Curated annotation (Swiss-Prot):
GO CC terms of this entry: cytoplasm; nucleoid
PANTHER family registered for this protein in UniProt: CELL DIVISION PROTEIN WHIA-RELATED
UniProt organism field: Bacillus subtilis (strain 168)
InterPro entries, per the entry: Homing_endonucl, Sporu_reg_WhiA_N_dom, Sporulation_regulator_WhiA, Sporulation_regulator_WhiA_C, WhiA_LAGLIDADG_dom
Protein name, per record: Probable cell division protein WhiA
Length: 316
């Protein structure tokens, strides 16, 4: 089961306050519902591929309105042949849709979220939960990028949903897609805050656990890469220094060098793997700083370059 599916399963098991039922139902029915007329009666079908969500819609409708509700199961014939669950009711359908602020006067479809429906903060949370159940998805935290989105068919609903999320400082944004619009979150911290707001606390903990391990692994990898780069740089410099010292030895002999340079040259030949700091601690005449060692080695590089190019060699 995907992380998104596990999150939705957790949400369908939450208790909902009486004052919040309409908010959650409104989101679920608005985003997954379809109206039709059968024998001059208005029929509403709410469709989902998630059995737990279908049961929740069925339960909330029965609890809030005590109407006759059917729960149908169909098999998809294309692509993945998953079950499709349809919650169907016609009894008082128009009155229920008006109560849920989906239909207005004169059978006008309300495309934005009603302010009256989400007056209380708990009702705002419930609407967001219903919207996520109806059209939401979230990436597994183990994947390469963090992403949570909720799909809406209408721009007005998408914009009002984005505004609702941002009342909780979630920094949500909107984007037009081919067949609708999405409200989305890209920051890991905001995704965990959203999961907290809608009550998916177990999913939040799992998300955070995976994120912490992933971020720690990335930090370790960055540190290792940095150390490797530094080590490669050190090895490269050491090999260059040894090559230059050997070239000097072949051309004029190390004996021709001043004592200070000759001493460092011999140490570098003998201890090619050590750092400049360690090299400085090996000087017989007394400890030399890292910068002092570096200065002398650069002087040896300079002498080697002068020998290669036929310039006048400066030994001091």
């Amino acid at each position: 089961m995907s992380f998104a599916s596990e999150t939705k399963k957790e949400l369908t098991n939450l208790e909902v306050k009486d004052c919040c039922i309409n908010a959650e139902l409104s989101a679920l029915i608005r985003m997954n519902g379809a109206l039709s007329f059968t024998n001059r009666h208005l029929v509403l079908d709410v469709q989902t591929e998630n059995a737990a969500i279908a049961r929740r819609i069925y339960t909330l409708l029965k609890k809030q309105y005590d109407v006759s509700v059917e729960l149908l199961v169909r098999k998809k014939m294309r692509l993945k042949k998953n079950n499709v669950y349809i919650v169907r009711f016609s009894e008082n359908a128009k009155a229920i849709l008006e109560d849920l602020k989906i239909l207005g006067e004169n059978f006008v479809f309300e495309r934005s979220i009603s302010k009256e429906l989400v007056k209380k903060r708990c009702c705002k949370r419930s609407y967001m939960r219903g919207a996520f159940l109806a059209g939401g998805s979230v990436n597994n935290p183990e994947t390469s990028s963090y992403h949570l989105e909720i799909f809406s068919l209408y721009k007005e609903h998408n914009d009002s949903l984005c505004d609702l999320l941002n009342e909780f400082q979630l920094n949500s944004k909107t984007l037009e897609r081919k067949k609708g619009y999405i409200t989305y979150l890209k920051e890991a911290e905001k995704i965990t805050e959203f999961l907290n707001v809608i009550g998916a606390h177990n999913s939040l903990l799992r998300f955070e656990d995976v994120r912490i391990v992933r971020d720690m692994r990335n930090s370790v990898n960055r540190l290792v890469n940095c150390e490797t780069a530094n080590l490669n740089k050190t090895i490269g410099a050491s090999l260059r220094q040894v090559e230059n010292i050997k070239y000097i030895d072949e051309r004029i002999g190390l004996e021709a060098l001043p004592e200070k340079l000759r001493e460092i040259a011999q140490l570098r030949i003998d201890y090619q793997e050590v750092t400049l700091k360690e090299l400085g601690e090996m000087v017989a005449s007394g400890k030399i700083s890292k910068s002092g060692i570096n200065h002398r080695l650069r002087k040896l590089d300079e002498i080697a370059e002068q020998l290669r190019t036929g310039q006048t060699v400066t030994l001091k």
